[in-house]
A protein has these predicted regions:
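C-terminal regulatory or interaction extensions
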Residues: 1-194
């Protein structure tokens, strides 16, 4: 199995709205937001994807299990995992997907405060914006643990400056063992939601 190096791990023990906000802040800190046009309008495909996967994870999670929900950013993908009251097993496909609300009261509140749209739109939006963001196709895997996998391109995760490839002589003079550790740490980001 691959070794996972943790960049930052925080436990979030708060209400659903603050959890959503903290996940968004954390992700924006660790993922680039390349310039993307949708027609003539600039859009943040990164933020659109994050909104969908976080609201899905929080609104459809099985809170009765002891499974700790996760959000992980790796070099070539990011994914969420959460306990699930499954209605089948295996990969969900956009063309054969039948949406099912697992926590209708939470989903309703999320729609009311604009953290979610109509049932099933999250999967369509995630496909659309993942194609724009990384050129890839997301995976949604249904089971006792629900997993959403978003492929990432190098544009989404590359670092600029002392931790990337654009060092200046001044940066090199100031490199310390801590900088080397930070470079290793930047390989993977792990987030736990409790």
């Amino acid at each position: 199995p691959p070794t996972i190096i943790t960049v930052a791990a925080i436990s979030i023990i708060t209400n659903l709205f603050d959890t959503f906000d903290r996940l968004m802040e954390f992700s924006k800190k660790h993922l680039n937001d390349p310039f993307i046009l949708e027609g003539v309008q600039a859009v943040s495909a990164r933020d659109a994807i994050l909104r969908e996967i976080f609201s899905n994870s929080l609104a459809h999670r099985d809170y009765s299990t002891g499974y700790v929900a996760k959000f992980v950013i790796e070099k070539d993908r990011m994914y969420t995992e959460n306990g699930n009251l499954s209605h089948g097993h295996g990969e969900l496909k956009l063309d054969g997907f039948e949406p099912f609300s697992k926590n209708p009261p939470i989903a309703k509140v999320f729609r009311e405060v604009s953290l979610a749209d109509e049932l099933g739109s999250g999967m369509r939006n995630t496909y659309k914006y993942t194609k724009m963001y990384s050129g890839g196709v997301p995976e949604f895997i249904e089971g006792d643990v629900f997993k959403t996998i978003i492929p990432l391109s190098s544009a989404a995760t590359s670092m600029v400056g002392p931790d990337g490839n654009q060092d200046t002589p001044q940066d090199n003079l100031q490199d310390t063992p801590q900088d080397n550790l930070q470079e290793k740490v930047n390989q993977v980001v792990y987030e736990k939601i409790i």
